[in-house]
Amino acid sequence: MPRKILVTNALPYANGDIHLGHLVGYIQGDIWVRYQRMRGNTVHYVCADDTHGTPVMLRAEKEGITPEALIGRVHGEHLRDFTDFGVAFDNYHSTHSVENRAYAEDVYTKLKAAELIDTRAIEQFYDPVKEMFLPDRFIKGECPKCGAADQYGDNCEACGAAYAPTELKNPHSAVSGAKPVLKTSEHYFFRLSDPRAVAFLREWTRGTNAAGTRRLQVEAANKMKEWLGDETVGDGGNTLSDWDISRDAPYFGFEIPGAPGKYFYVWLDAPIGYFASFRNLAEQRGDIAVDDFTDAVRAETAGTEMVHFIGKDILYFHALFWPAMLRFAGYRTPTQLCVNGFLTVDGAKMSKSRGTFITARSYVSRGLNPEWLRYYFATKSNGTMEDVDLSLDDMVAKVNSDLVGKYVNIASRCAGFIAKRFDGKLGASDPQATADFEAAFAAGTIAHAYEERDYGRALREIMRLADLANQYVNDHKPWELAKQEGQEAHLHVVCSTALTHFRDLTLYLKPVLPALAQKVEAFLAIDPLVWPQTWQPLPAAHTINPYAHLMTRVERKQIDALLEANRESLAPAAPAAKVASSQQRHAEKQQHEAQSAETAMPHISIDDFTKVDLRIARIVGAEHVEGADKLIRLRLDIGESENGQAKLRQVFAGIKSAYDPATLVGRLTVMVANLAPRKMKFGVSEGMVLAASSADDKSSGIYLLSPDTGAASGMRVK
């Protein structure tokens, strides 16, 4: 039975441009939606602009326009950028809408009825000139720890200290420059620390959905444990505090019912925007039963799903506040959170001074193909919270090698012969061609990888098939057959078979490269490709259209021009830009310190290095180790055999905090093959797999090393 899924992406804030860092998560979501639709599932894909809050209000004031005018303009800009990159929402709405107001008020009213709303008096800074309470980020002063000037009200960019705004020395308003005064105001709180909420969240964050899939990736679930604690010990170690859901006027947002001058905090109504956009879509369409996807009882009866694609910076809101709000207001909770990491460029934080803080608009306006980036981001996505590094040289190499050199090359080498020699009509397919059989055989592997959002694994398998298809062409040499008398029939079969292989590859690449797939469908004169139930070659006598160039190579000069277009002047920064430049200097300092720490190792000789036997290993089995907090048991194929059978190695790897075992099976990694076996209480570990982590423990990530496309089990790393 087809699945019925509501899919959302995180709502971008209506106070800035879409940049490449944003696009990581949106492209991941769009690929998954396209794959599900190719499988025949019903998917509603919605998003919206997150429009409320002090920053929007102040930016509109600075521009001399209303907040409504600002968010209207930004809405058009955001939708244009998403469309250019093939992110095809069914509806792109706004949180400043009648639907969102209705949902926000309903959720609040039901939480209040459940006795989960409190009011308390709090003391906070107030700007006497602007006559407004100041959020932490709109208060500046000297750090109470290190004395650094021009620091925000919640943390110091120079020393990293966290503190309350009232601890700042010589504070001033970042809005007016005035010295703020302390005033008391009544605020509204969602009682997240209530035992009912804590018990629910412990179960929800650690559990599985109706399909048996984890609601949270293993890394996300482990992070939630830090906040929710262990219910078997005392008070459980719960560190959740009640959540302030109100802000004082002036504020751009929705006023709280029965509380004049008090507004819903932006993070209360922002995720509710998912429901609002969906209801707005239903009103446009007229054939969607909204409550089947949003009401707790009806959603369970209808068997619908709700999947959120978000960045790890907003995990706290989506894994704690959002499901608790929904649960106690009578709405359905998310089926799954798909959390992506941050984007770095060439191994470092995006930087305006280096030109790597790249907006979507500048990328498109410089003439770069958005599908180059879609493909590259997909190759780096593995369904975990790992950060994605955009290595610009690697992107050039991957696109040119994989898409142009392998994939498009199949059609460009064979289509001309069909047009010139056979009037555009295909012949019979070669029944002995193994590439077609391999393509059919790989369907399950690729489908599973797409389902798990392990797009990198899917694309590695697809490129393996592309290698087989190219090998078929190379073995039969159609360019030589065309010169030989009496080889017309053979030439016809070879070129027709190659184009069937090309069709198969296009089908698999379609979720990632929808625009290119559409061109191929037109070239081959076929119906839109859907996930196959059975595999059939393109029929004999089928007429294809003349071949037109499908994709150009990436030139390094295009990348250099893009960086230059995004590089800010290195002249002294204007006062308004001091904050950003200070942050960048601090980030670059941290990066330099980390690099220094990680490279300060004694030299070894080449003879020492050659003693280490590094092999490519395929993970054929992975499972948790009972009684071990950090270990996963891996079974590895490094090309060894015994009595004609593959001999597998067992390795215990301390990567449990970063990986779900199910996502590791089939993946290639690097293993130290000649490490002496080590006897542990769980068994014997017969080697070591390689992973990266921060040398100074400031970053908690663990990143398993994976070789590039083309590597195979047993190959030596030299």
Curated annotation (Swiss-Prot):
Subcellular location: Cytoplasm
Span of the annotated motif 'HIGH' region: 12-22
Enzyme class, first EC level, given as a word: ligase
Region described as Disordered: spans on this chain: 573-599
Residue stretches in coiled coil: none
GO biological process: methionyl-tRNA aminoacylation
Domain tRNA-binding: 608-718
Binding residues annotated for Zn(2+), in chain numbering: 143, 146, 156, 159
PROSITE patterns per the UniProt record, alphabetical: AA_TRNA_LIGASE_I, TRBD
Protein origin, superkingdom: Bacteria
InterPro entries per record: aa-tRNA-synth_I_CS (IPR001412), Anticodon_Met (IPR041872), Met-tRNA-synth_bsu_C (IPR004495), Met-tRNA_ligase_1 (IPR023458), Met-tRNA_synth (IPR014758), Methionyl/Leucyl_tRNA_Synth (IPR015413), MetRS_core (IPR033911), MetRS_Zn (IPR029038)
EC number(s) on file: 6.1.1.10
Binding site for ATP: 352
Cofactor binding description: Binds 1 zinc ion per subunit.
Pfam families in alphabetical order: Anticodon_3, tRNA-synt_1g, tRNA_bind
Cofactor(s) listed: Zn(2+)
Function: Is required not only for elongation of protein synthesis but also for the initiation of all mRNA translation through initiator tRNA(fMet) aminoacylation.
HAMAP family recorded: Met_tRNA_synth_type1
Descriptive protein name: Methionine--tRNA ligase
